[in-house]
Amino acid sequence: MPDAKKQGRSNKAMTFFVCFLAALAGLLFGLDIGVIAGALPFIADEFQITSHTQEWVVSSMMFGAAVGAVGSGWLSFKLGRKKSLMIGAILFVAGSLFSAAAPNVEVLILSRVLLGLAVGVASYTAPLYLSEIAPEKIRGSMISMYQLMITIGILGAYLSDTAFSYTGAWRWMLGVIIIPAILLLIGVFFLPDSPRWFAAKRRFVDAERVLLRLRDTSAEAKRELDEIRESLQVKQSGWALFKENSNFRRAVFLGVLLQVMQQFTGMNVIMYYAPKIFELAGYTNTTEQMWGTVIVGLTNVLATFIAIGLVDRWGRKPTLTLGFLVMAAGMGVLGTMMHIGIHSPSAQYFAIAMLLMFIVGFAMSAGPLIWVLCSEIQPLKGRDFGITCSTATNWIANMIVGATFLTMLNTLGNANTFWVYAALNVLFILLTLWLVPETKHVSLEHIERNLMKGRKLREIGAHD
């Protein structure tokens, strides 16, 4: 009995280590999102570019990410989750090198597209891999660790941007990504491949070997393998399954909708244009804007711990609903303050408090939980196709948000822009209550059975 307990502890440690290494992809994702906020003013100054070109510098990465996400389904299915992560790490190294050395804005935009390809591969593969590796009781927490790494990456980028801002060294801001990219590349060599990918390839011995390393007991590993075998009895897969099976189409639709909801909360507007938003709040000094951006990043990291604590205790659906409510309030009040005018130090502090409240709402809910849900709701035979659709949607929506914010400010005005995002968050509360299932402590195979039986989307996580 003591040996069994010792083995269980050893396997838990191994599972955590594997999940941590995979989540490092999120760190690079976050660094890529964060570095451009601080570098953009210096890039605009050096290359003398317009607001429209600045939007392209920001959104070119999202275009690359959408392309990378679309290609990742095929890549992940053919080569496996591990090799896909390896390819993503190589692209991160190459993209950051070219970005830092860009002689003109055209090369910089192309380099950002290359980085986007890396982010697309990572944002597709890492949550999928984590959902297939982690045991059901901690699956939400482990996938949320990926989002935590994103927020740590954003904070790290803001800190390095602030450090380099005193000399305007934007090339160093963009170049720091190389170091963690190399660490990820080394770390991936130590990862096992997904047991569900092995099973999909009919390599059941390999699947069992991985499960025996990662589960507390051999009985638990064998039970999980039996459930995986059962889910493989569906004859069609991918596009064929999408065409023939209306229940699978519902899951793909929900995944796409969830990613649209995440992006149109307005969070990445703040991530990409944080210094600009601080300027709107009355902070005209560049140093104040940069340190304000660091506070945004730190709040994002700390609030993500709330999600990790709640996701496997309180559940996905109530946490998500509360988050959208907090974000709607934050954006609504911020828009009202922009309308009235921010003329005093106390008004400035209150505006920043509303901004930080919005960030807490996102980081505790839509930030991690959308990735959790999208990786849970797709059936095994259609998982690569379904997550390709949802991840590509994430980046297309992300690109639209990044490419339109400055235009919205110029055409709608500051207050109306923030009110639009507040109204969208209210809409997302209603959509969550209507469509989103509770998947806490439910196996992926049980969710799949409910989906394929034709149960309502909001009920596919229900126990029989």
From Swiss-Prot:
A GO molecular-function descriptor: galactose:proton symporter activity
Residues spanning the membrane: 16-36, 57-77, 85-105, 113-133, 140-160, 172-192, 251-271, 291-311, 322-342, 352-372, 395-415, 417-437
A GO CC annotation given for this chain: plasma membrane
Keyword Secreted: no
Key words of the record: Cell inner membrane, Cell membrane, Membrane, Sugar transport, Symport, Transmembrane, Transmembrane helix, Transport
Entry keyword Cell inner membrane: yes
SUPFAM superfamilies: MFS general substrate transporter (SSF103473)
Major location category of this protein: membrane
Periplasmic side stretches: 37-56, 106-112, 161-171, 272-290, 343-351, 416
InterPro entries attached to this UniProt entry: MFS_dom, MFS_sugar_transport-like, MFS_trans_sf, Myo-inositol_Transporter, Sugar/inositol_transpt, Sugar_transporter_CS
Topology term for the membrane: Multi-pass membrane protein
One example of a Gene Ontology biological process annotation: galactose transmembrane transport
Pfam families: Sugar_tr
Location(s) in or outside the cell: Cell inner membrane
UniProt xrefs under CDD domains: MFS_GLUT_like
Signal peptide residues on this chain, from the entry's feature table: none
All ranges on the Cytoplasmic side of the membrane: 1-15, 78-84, 134-139, 193-250, 312-321, 373-394, 438-464
The family this protein is said to belong to: Belongs to the major facilitator superfamily. Sugar transporter (TC 2.A.1.1) family.
NCBIfam families per UniProt: SP
Role summary: Uptake of galactose across the boundary membrane with the concomitant transport of protons into the cell (symport system).
UniProt name for this protein: Galactose-proton symporter
